[in-house]
Amino acid sequence: MGKIIGIDLGTTNSCVAVMDGKNARVIENGEGDRTTPSIVAYAQDGEILVGQPAKRQAVTNSQNTLFAIKRLIGRRFEDAEVQRDVSIMPYKIIKADNGDAWVEARNEKMAPPQVSAEVLKKMKKTAEDYLGEPVTEAVITVPAYFNDAQRQATKDAGRIAGLDVKRIINEPTAAALAYGLDREVGNRTIAVYDLGGGTFDISIIEIDEVDGEKTYEVLSTNGDTHLGGEDFDSRLINYLVDEFKKEQGIDLRNDPLAMQRLKEAAEKAKIELSSAQQTDVNLPYVTADATGPKHLNIKVTRAKLESLVEDLVKRSMDPVKVALEDAGLKVSEVNDVILVGGQTRMPMVQKTVAEFFGKEPRKDVNPDEAVAMGAAVQGGVLAGDVKDVLLLDVTPLSLGIETMGGVMTSLIAKNTTIPTKHSQVFSTAEDNQSAVTIHVLQGERKRASDNKSLGQFNLDGIQPAPRGMPQIEVTFDIDADGILHVSAKDKNSGREQNITIKASSGLNEEEIQKMVRDAEANAEADRKFEELVQTRNQADQLVHGTRKQIEEAGDKLAANDKEAIEKALSELEIASKGEDKAAIEAKLQALVEASKPLLEIAQQQAQAGAGNTADATDAGAKKDDDVVDAEFEEVDGKDKK
């Protein structure tokens, strides 16, 4: 059985880890980095770039460079959060036929799981390069506050990338697993504050250790799936745009190229201000008008940045209070606070969390890597490599159905340990009703329409009876991934209907299979492209080497041979510019054949050279016989010895 890898599929960066003996090891990617930007770019020649290469070309290809896709996964186009992103993202967010938020690049419409699959493929390849064997199974993390639709969409992304997703695990829970892996923790209650690139989570977790066996029980979880580092960046970008407009009278929002440069500069400035009190945002030639080029140079202090994002940091504390209340704990009962996610490096975030909990957060957990490491631990548990670890996670939001009067009736309350199953009997609202619609909802509001609709199905064939008489048993079954299966059964007739709640990413099985096939076709195309490039490189080397040999041969090469070689060289150079690998290989072989006279000349020169060397050696030896050994003095400074 191969390794089950752990992947932290982040909004801004992604990370992959694997169990190496008893420890989780983060794997460096092809660029030598331990994290990979979650950025996918579609180049003009059809090439798909992922990670750092995609980030590097974003300035000149902003409309086809997709980032922060996780904020769209499993969401409807009409969602308020999506509409907010539509107005600020440089790429196109569109409404799919089924009402979901999709994206468009190079005139191709794509579902967010399709784009995320490209990042997962890079993570998969990173692991395969390190392990030296194919990887087919993974544990992928999601924000704890992701709803059912977002979890299913993440699972779909894994399938499109060619991965069998063994488990979807909550990010804070994964961080807790990493924290407890190599520590004697005893019995402790920890708070995991996870502020990443696009999402925020807080989980209160109890770790019990008995005879070396650790049980991680999530007591409660809460969060905001649209609050993260990207929002902090946006505040700083808007400030810089407004300042530049005051100085120069030009609104950079109308210039996509300038905005992309500004985005990179703002992100860099934000990071610098975590360690420095002040930084310069300096962008020469950021734009131009009739009077000439314009340069942006604005000083930003840490205090200024903090004033811009203060309300965002405060906003993150509301879910923290709710999570503690749901867990039935006082602040003083939390033993340790763990910070996860790159945005927690901001001093203001650390200070706010420390003040709330009355203790300094732990600094010995890497905020960028802990989640992937925890996912690898869970992979090890599932593979049987890691023993003595039991994980009890929870469902983040209440689940129920719409009942008479547009009310949501909960069947499973939020923070219920999963997997779990719950049944409840309902009846008809009208006399002789022959069918009922089961409308499945997720959320905490009483009004059904205020909650997230996960899907609906009909149970028909109910025998005519007065209202309230038929007995319809509705069963909710949540698996270990937090994904919901719903069934409804007419207890009188025995008729049953069930549904696995599909993500509102709306990808049906056929669409997923098509995307899987497309991904496989791309992998084949990538392999062929790589082989073509290798053949071109061979051709270039041979052309270079042959020209050098022609030069060295000089007059020794017959004119007709030289002409034949030059012709073969020219044909190979033309073939190398094409896309036909077989044609390049044929011309390579033709040049090798035509160059045989050059090989003969080189051999003759080598033999002649060897003969001359032998003569010189004999003469040297004869000369040595006449040499007299001289006496010598070793001189050190002025003293003779």
Curated annotation (Swiss-Prot):
Coiled coil: none annotated. It comes from the Bacteria. Keywords: ATP-binding, Chaperone, Nucleotide-binding, Phosphoprotein, Stress response. Gene3D superfamilies: 1.20.1270.10, 3.30.420.40, Actin, Chain A, domain 4, Substrate Binding Domain Of DNAk, Chain A, domain 1. Residues 604-619 have a biased composition (Low complexity). SUPFAM superfamilies: Actin-like ATPase domain, Heat shock protein 70kD (HSP70), C-terminal subdomain, Heat shock protein 70kD (HSP70), peptide-binding domain. The modification Phosphothreonine is found at T199. Residues 604-641 are annotated as: Disordered. Belongs to the heat shock protein 70 family. NCBIfam families: PRK00290.1, PRK05183.1, prok_dnaK. HAMAP family: DnaK (MF_00332). Acts as a chaperone. This is Chaperone protein DnaK. It comes from Proteus mirabilis (strain HI4320). The gene is dnaK.
